[in-house]
């Protein structure tokens, strides 16, 4: 199933977008900055009857097989999530005006912030079509303000432990207020002085907390370098073993 999905998307997009790259999750640097990042997922796994160690071992085995036997770059970097890898590779196409076309195959809306680059598009397997918004810059600002409950990141009106304490609930946030903050900095969220003036101290503190977790521009430089090194080290992989591997796996050609 995994191999057939890779084949399907490679066939669908390779002529226009070139080389397929597989981005893989590792432990996240974000947990070092915010202890509650994805904390509920760990709790859910502990309560689940599924043997998660065995499951992740299976996935890691597939990852290693593909990296060894197939010609696609498989990028797996310590402390980097797949989101980080995709973001860094997409951003690298902006250097020196290269602008090579990029297609992100994912239903994850976290990548919408990368749509600010005209050469970056996204295909959602869940929607079976393009994923897009009218204003990706505002979308990122709104996303930071609202947080991301699936990752354990509360909105910027709520405490750090909102999603890990029993009965914790977020303070409601109005869309009108988000628009006021956005307008206060004229759509330039890097204008720290404007944001500080528009928000109180706690709001701005929580905004910065969320920005670090959500904004893909905040990936540490050492991790960015490791991602690019891992990617570049896999250029020109040998295709000689691919056919034998596909036949062994009874892959549908």
What is the predicted function of each stretch?
Residues 31-34, 109-111, 204, 210-211:
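Generic secondary-structure boundary/loop-capping signal
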Residues 148-227, 239-245, 249-253:
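Accessory alpha-helical DNA-binding modules that contact the DNA backbone or grooves
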Residues 61, 110, 241:
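Short Gly/charged-rich anion-binding patches and loops
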Residues 78, 82, 89-173, 177, ...:
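Long, highly charged, low-complexity intrinsically disordered interaction regions
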Residues 52-54, 134-136, 245-246:
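Short C-terminal domain-edge/linker segments immediately following a structured domain
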Residues 231-239:
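Amphipathic alpha-helical surface "interface" segments used
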Residues 8, 36, 137-142, 162, ...:
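Intrinsically disordered, low-complexity N-terminal regions enriched in serine/proline/glycine
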Residues 1-103, 116-129, 215, 222, ...:
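Noncatalytic, basic helical substrate-engagement surface that gates or grips nucleic-acid strands
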